[in-house]
């Protein structure tokens, strides 16, 4: 759908930077899932939070061990099916789940670049789909490129990328700072506020 030079630039980053980038984007999608769970009483919105917290832990705690196989298994049951709901919110919730699944798969396979690109695309797609739904029509890639909400999402992804790219080595304080800032903001990539 939407290509961006950030996808090429991600190649320059190390694995820990890819994982942090994905965790940041999942943090920004979490409110979409949490709000959906609250509105529909679907599943347990906290499972997303717990898994994402475990991922942050692996980035900041030396030798933190997590069984991502079993986490993924638990999580798969917590993904809503679009056909079961007549509610737009199910789509951003599913996108959030897709992103977190990509992140867990990257922890299992050790392949982080492709997953980081997929998480980036998933987040931008959530934004673009909402914009098209609100406009009541399809938009061309050219239109989407100049759409303010889409531009803002790319800007935030670039900002996270630049902060990570500036690091020579794993910077625990930066990782903790990114996590704290995003959680404190509590706002999703489509403007949903869900204070935790």
UniProtKB/Swiss-Prot annotation:
It holds the Pfam family DUF416. Gene3D superfamilies: YP_001051499.1 domain like (1.20.1590.10). InterPro entries: DUF416 (IPR007338), YP001051499.1-like_dom_sf (IPR023381). To H.influenzae HI_0431. This is Uncharacterized protein YjaG. It comes from Salmonella typhimurium (strain LT2 / SGSC1412 / ATCC 700720).
């Amino acid at each position: 759908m939407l290509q961006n030079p950030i996808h090429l630039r991600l190649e320059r980053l190390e694995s820990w930077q890819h994982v942090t980038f994905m965790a940041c984007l999942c943090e920004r999608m979490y409110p979409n899932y949490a709000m959906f769970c609250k509105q529909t009483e679907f599943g347990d919105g906290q499972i997303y939070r717990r898994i994402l917290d475990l991922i942050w832990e692996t980035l900041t705690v030396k030798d933190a061990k997590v069984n991502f196989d079993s986490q993924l298994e638990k999580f798969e049951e917590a993904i809503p099916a679009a056909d079961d709901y007549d509610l737009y919110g199910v789509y951003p919730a599913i996108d959030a789940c897709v992103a977190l699944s990509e992140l867990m798969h990257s922890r299992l396979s050790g392949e982080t670049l492709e997953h980081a690109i997929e998480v980036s695309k998933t987040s931008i797609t959530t934004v673009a789909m909402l914009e098209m739904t609100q406009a009541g029509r399809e938009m061309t890639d050219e239109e989407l490129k100049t759409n303010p909400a889409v531009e803002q999402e790319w800007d935030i992804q670039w900002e996270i990328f630049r902060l990570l790219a500036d690091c020579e080595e794993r910077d625990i304080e930066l990782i903790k700072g990114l996590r704290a800032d995003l959680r404190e903001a509590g706002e999703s990539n489509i403007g949903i506020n869900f204070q935790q």
